[in-house]
């Protein structure tokens, strides 16, 4: 996620572009949402000076980053939503009996988020279990 009024945010999120997977993007503001199929399409629109007049304030990109990791500002993860869900599950254990850790995009993460996959999975499990 990132704020659209932060000039460096577009360059930061552009580092996540890679051709293997689609990374849908949604913007919100003024009670409306705009949807983009993939990051390059979104970046082209967001960089257009006319876009600023649409009142969009925040953008979120579909990209599975490790829960234990936080991207460099001005980007941020949305793992607080996962934390809320895990908090709910603590008091409602019947809500979910298993968890899935999605790792398929980890191999195409920007370099500063790259680690050996076994280490990433171990850290991901550690983070999830620490929340339970």
Show which residues each predicted segment covers.
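Histidine-acidic metal/acid-base catalytic patches
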Residues: 1-132
């Amino acid at each position: 996620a990132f704020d659209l009024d932060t000039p460096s945010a577009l360059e930061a999120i552009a580092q996540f572009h890679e051709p293997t997977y689609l990374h849908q993007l949604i913007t919100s503001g003024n009670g409306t949402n705009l949807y983009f199929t993939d990051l390059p399409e979104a970046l082209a629109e967001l960089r257009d000076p006319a876009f600023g007049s649409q009142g969009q304030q925040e953008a979120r990109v579909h990209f599975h980053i490790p829960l234990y990791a936080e991207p460099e500002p001005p980007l941020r993860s949305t793992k607080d939503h996962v934390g809320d869900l895990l908090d709910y599950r603590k008091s409602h254990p019947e809500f979910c009996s298993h968890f899935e850790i999605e790792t398929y995009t980890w191999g195409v993460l920007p370099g500063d988020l790259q680690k050996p996959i076994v280490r990433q999975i171990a850290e991901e499990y550690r983070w999830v279990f620490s929340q339970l």
